[in-house]
Amino acid sequence: MEKGARNIMVSVALKYEPLELEAPKSPIFLPTPLKYGSVSIAQMVSNGHRYDASAYNIEAMNALRKVKRNKYGYIDLLGKNGLINNAFVGNRFKRIYTENYKDIPFFLPSDIENIYPKATKYISAKTNTDIDSLKVKTDMLLMSVSGTIGKTAIVRQRLNDCVFSHDLLRIDFKDKYDLGYVYAFMNTKVGLLILQSNNYGAVIDHIEPEHLANVPIPNVPNELKKVIHNSIIESYDLRDKSNDLIDEAQNLLYNELQLPDINTIKGENYAENKGFKNYVIKVNQLNDRLDGSYHIPEVEEIIKAVSKNAAEVTTLGDNRISSKIILPERFKRIYVDKDHGVPFFGGKQLLSLNPTNVKYLSLIHHRNRIENQLLLEKNMCAVTCSGTIGKIMIVPQHWEGWTLNQHVMRVKPANESIAGYIYAWLDSPYAKPLIIRNTYGAVVDEIDDNQLSTVAIPLLKNKQVQQKINDLVLEANELRYQAYLKEQEAINQMNKIIDATSLMA
């Protein structure tokens, strides 16, 4: 450094300006809210010394507190002062299933949520059990006790004296208004949470009748119970009227086509008395299908029977019948909360009036797919196409704007004057084999939209009868919507009762 030069120190001050991060607009980027609660030592001991949080349901604990702090007070369902007169399940027994429709129709627990319950099995009269003890009676409450606990249904006239599986809880009440009142409670989120846990909030996977002694319910005056009960019973009566109209429509269809009983339609085997089905198919009839189930003779016999008295037998893909058959593509789903999505459910809940376990698809991420493939419209026909093939449902008004998953195809009718007729045919026992014959897949059964479009559908000579069939089904579908509104009216009133907290709480 030269003589006389000075050292100069330069100081630089840097101002830090924090970057303002924009709050995430989509709720899917937000962390899941933390759930927490306290559990006493006594609760842990009663729950088998379980220390893992998954063994306890925090929401169920909160639900219990809510009911017990209700302004009306509470009462346990079962007990000396409870609402239930009797609750029981049947005795276990070895079932002898048959394929003979003349045997005893047998309903399974999974059937009780269906808007039109139909027996899916038959058991032999030789079954070693007291069949009469399995019959249900009018104004019983039925409840599933395992699997999905707490599914409920009310027995009305159509199901009176029907034989149900032993593993359903049958409940009778002391007062007639308690039936609809308890049903409404069990169809609220609070009621279901309490039922699916024990009295300490521990998670359970099976219930017995005595479990109901630990289920509290608001102890409202009879006037309130009566209002809720009447709405629920009216809902169930509307369902029965709806099913009566569908029966009437389908009977008109069968009579006009002069169809024999489906159980009498049998195909001929190439060689009888061999113990298995065997038949001959011409090469020009193979239709590129070498699987025997596609060519079962019963299918051809059904088509022959239908063709005899029909004006014409066309296919579901005919543009006079449907404007579009939609098979949604598979996709990775992004679920959000109720306020930011569209209701989304699957084929398992297809036959329910009000599907349970509904999730919500993100509108932000799936808008195009929802609008073009998934969205439901009133009077569409929904057909399951994966797993259990051929379950049919006509879309009611309250499902409009909801979505179904890719395991259910949508048949969009050409117009309103054919929409109900499509359902009347597809939901018949004559159409089901025509759908199922198209099944393919080694592990999971599947059919696609092209195959569904080839399913035969008859057009009637008498167009007035065909129109009447259509109108009866559409009227039935409207009654289902009214039944839904009545049930929701009762459930909403029940929720208001549950939310009415005592000032002393």
What are these regions (language model features)?
Residues I131-D132, V145-A184, G346, T384-W425:
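A short beta-sheet element
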Residues D161-L169, G201-E223, W402-M409, Y440-V465:
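A short glycine-rich beta-alpha junction/loop motif
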Residues P105-L108, L141-S144, P343-G346, C381-T384:
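Short hydrophobic-aromatic micro-motifs
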